[in-house]
Amino acid sequence: MADSSFDVVSKVDRQEVDNALHQAEKELNTRYDFRGTGAKIEWSGEDKIVLTAEAEERVKAALEVFKEKLIRRDISLKAFDAGEPVASGKTYKITGTLVQGIDAEHAKKISKKIRDEGPKGVKAQIQGDELRVSSKKRDDLQAVIALLKSEDFGIALQFVNYR
């Protein structure tokens, strides 16, 4: 019998993030406490989001609105890395980045966790920005998924291609 396997990835559905951004933008335009503050949220390039407002507390509040919308769209906050408010002229700006892919450091941590605490006979291989986990028994793979879900690696993990 062939080995069963699945991939551990860290990807974000950009369309869902775009929907969350538009919902947050709509709320910023209609909420009374954001009137006249110049609060805006917009894309900057492929994976950066910029929030601007005329006061530091308003830009932080706009960030909270955006995070709330991300949660509602089932996007992990670990996938969005927001910076600190930066004063630029009369406005304050927060630049956030969408974090995608598992870097080598996190992949090694995850692989070590599987080797140390996972069931015997489970193999983890690093393949670029994802991790392939394989085993002869599907039950062992389920145990590995449960193990990885219980641990916090600081990035959003998804489990795909379960065969």
Swiss-Prot record:
Keywords associated with the record: Nucleotide-binding
Transmembrane spans: none
Highest taxon in the source lineage: Bacteria
InterPro entries membership: DUF520, UPF0234-like_C, UPF0234_N, YajQ-like_sf
MF terms in GO: nucleotide binding
SUPFAM superfamilies in UniProt: YajQ-like (SSF89963)
GO CC, alphabetical: cytosol
Keyword RNA-binding: no
One Pfam family, short name: DUF520
Role played: Nucleotide-binding protein.
Cited PANTHER family: UPF0234 PROTEIN YAJQ
Similarity field: Belongs to the YajQ family.
Protein's UniProt name: Nucleotide-binding protein NFA_51200
